[in-house]
Amino acid sequence: METPRYRRVILKLSGEALAGSQGFGIAHEMLVTVAEQVVEIQKLGVEVALVVGGGNIWRGIAGSKQGMDRANADYMGMLATVMNALALQDAMEKAGAATRVLSAIEMRQVAEPYIRRRAIRHLEKGRVVIFAAGTGNPYFSTDTTAALRAAEIEAEAILMAKRVDGVYDSDPLKNPEAKKYDRLTFLDVLSQGLGVMDSTAASLCMDNNIPLIVFDLNKKGNIRKGIMGESIGTYVGRDK
């Protein structure tokens, strides 16, 4: 049996990734894709936690640009992540994985409150943990949530699922001449303003030496390849 390179990981899913080709809402086929791949790596003994965004339902920044109070708009975005988390939980359990949703905003009827020790214990018991409601604070992205939770649960890497197969110097969906990077440092990301994650999240990963693997979610088997240490997408670390 092959030995995974990483034993405990955070899988970061954007809301847009869950929307699939429809661009809005939750695409059932994307839920199934994620669930099947997570169950696959669980069978290798990997402990998996997910952080999910809410951009397929609501984006706080977009709301604030329309004149909404930024904090209120961000709280709406956090609630959107809870909806995505519950959809993922349903798909995971149908695929055979024991799952717990932990919310940074308390809502006991649908999720457990986020407690660091409880999250770690769930992982140790072989459950998939889904972190919902971001950090529970406005002005912080779900990328920052992924970096923060990874540091808290001592995850060995963050796997960042995207609609493109890595990090480029410009948007490959708009520029066919965009150059793809195979390896980057967090300083590269910060100094060049590459759109991998926001600066708060990148700094947190760099300070805590948490590597980032950016990959295409639509290619089946990519999560397993990333866990095994195979070269997929773009690797971002403290050093190249």
From Swiss-Prot:
Question: By its UniProt entry, which InterPro entries does this protein fall under?
Answer: AceGlu_kinase-like_sf, Asp/Glu/Uridylate_kinase, Uridylate_kinase, Uridylate_kinase_bac
What ranges does the record give for the region Involved in allosteric activation by GTP, renumbered to this chain?
Answer: 20-25
Q: Which residues bind UMP?
A: 54, 74, 135-142
Q: Which Gene3D superfamilies match?
A: Acetylglutamate kinase-like (3.40.1160.10)
Recorded metabolic or biological pathway in which this protein acts: Pyrimidine metabolism; CTP biosynthesis via de novo pathway; UDP from UMP (UMPK route): step 1/1
Q: How is its activity regulated?
A: Allosterically activated by GTP. Inhibited by UTP.
Q: Where does ATP bind?
A: 12-15, 55, 59, 168, 171
Question: What EC number(s) would the UniProt record show?
Answer: 2.7.4.22
Q: Which GO terms describe its cellular component?
A: cytoplasm
What keywords appear on the UniProt entry? Allosteric enzyme, ATP-binding, Cytoplasm, Kinase, Nucleotide-binding, Pyrimidine biosynthesis, Transferase
GO biological process annotation, one example = UDP biosynthetic process
Q: Where in the cell is it found?
A: Cytoplasm
Enzyme superclass (EC): transferase
Q: Does the keyword Nucleotide-binding apply?
A: yes
Signal peptide annotation = none
> Per its UniProt record, what CDD domains does this chain match?
AAK_UMPK-PyrH-Ec (cd04254)
Question: Which protein family is named in the record?
Answer: Belongs to the UMP kinase family.
Q: Which HAMAP family does its entry note?
A: PyrH_B
Q: What does this protein do?
A: Catalyzes the reversible phosphorylation of UMP to UDP.
Designated name of the protein: Uridylate kinase
- The scientific name of the source species is Desulfitobacterium hafniense (strain Y51)
Q: Upper lineage ranks?
A: Bacteria, Bacillati, Bacillota, Clostridia, Eubacteriales
